[in-house]
């Protein structure tokens, strides 16, 4: 409960990567269509901040879906893979995979910007939301405060956020 944040990395081999290297298949999601990182980064910006991520989570009884998303960025590596960096104070169940899945649906043209905006403005579970496969997801870093602040941070982490605390989209 003392962590102040976590960073996940998700790896995608899209159509621009000219096929999936067999050595990468165990930790990379193969998406046949080309993805435009600049367009995905622009769309991802609207998800940043303290908000209700119910549309992108599998809710757990008694838990909040309000989280502070600090970074959601798509970068093409030298090898042609796309690395998605996702940083938040905490994550709901399936949140990273749901966010990546939703943005890939948008990036491949299977969903439009209005659909993505609707997920943000009106949080709620949608059965058709694509969950990105788990094998391409890795926990990269956990952030902690100075040891003398562990107790304070643990209290903040245990406090359940309420709907009125989330920013409006």
Kindly give the residue locations of the regions a language model identified.
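Structured-RNA-binding interfaces characteristic of tRNA pseudouridine synthases
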Residues: 1-169
